[in-house]
């Protein structure tokens, strides 16, 4: 898959692979932000696992899918959200309250909006998954 934004391509590719029933997907090229988002997806139970593979170029991630993703995507442009403003973005990107996850980049790293709300910190909404 070619495009200008590897992050968006990674999420769209995983979404497409899940929708046709594939059990794995290769994300190329690898980046720190993609790795951090995959860690959040793993922690929230959306993927079975992932592994970084050094191919001598930019690297890649082998992602084990488990069929738990109905839809995922990048949020463009990146919206800033305070710790008390996540509900507005939940209404916009998620189908129901407490169903799905917004992925947020904060000064404490990449995390789900549930963790950010719990810690009382805001950040930029970069992706959603449900």
From Swiss-Prot:
One of its GO terms (biological process) is translation. This is Small ribosomal subunit protein uS8. Part of the 30S ribosomal subunit. InterPro entries: Ribosomal_uS8, Ribosomal_uS8_CS, Ribosomal_uS8_sf. One of the primary rRNA binding proteins, it binds directly to 16S rRNA central domain where it helps coordinate assembly of the platform of the 30S subunit. SUPFAM superfamilies: Ribosomal protein S8 (SSF56047). It comes from Halorubrum lacusprofundi (strain ATCC 49239 / DSM 5036 / JCM 8891 / ACAM 34). Belongs to the universal ribosomal protein uS8 family. Keywords: Ribonucleoprotein, Ribosomal protein, RNA-binding, rRNA-binding. GO terms for cellular component: ribonucleoprotein complex; ribosome. The keyword Iron does not apply. The keyword Ribonucleoprotein applies. GO terms for molecular function: rRNA binding; structural constituent of ribosome. It comes from the Archaea.
């Amino acid at each position: 898959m070619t495009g200008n934004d590897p992050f968006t391509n990674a999420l769209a590719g995983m979404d497409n692979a899940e929708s046709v029933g594939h059990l794995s997907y290769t994300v190329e090229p690898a980046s720190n932000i993609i790795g951090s988002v995959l860690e959040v997806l793993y922690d929230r139970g959306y993927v079975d696992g992932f592994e970084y593979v050094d191919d001598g170029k930019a690297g890649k991630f082998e992602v084990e899918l488990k069929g738990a993703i109905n839809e995922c995507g990048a949020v463009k442009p990146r919206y800033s959200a305070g710790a008390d403003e996540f509900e507005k973005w939940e209404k916009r990107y998620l189908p129901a309250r407490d169903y799905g996850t917004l992925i947020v980049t904060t000064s404490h790293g990449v995390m789900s909006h549930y963790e950010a709300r719990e810690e009382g910190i805001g950040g930029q909404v970069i992706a959603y998954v449900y």
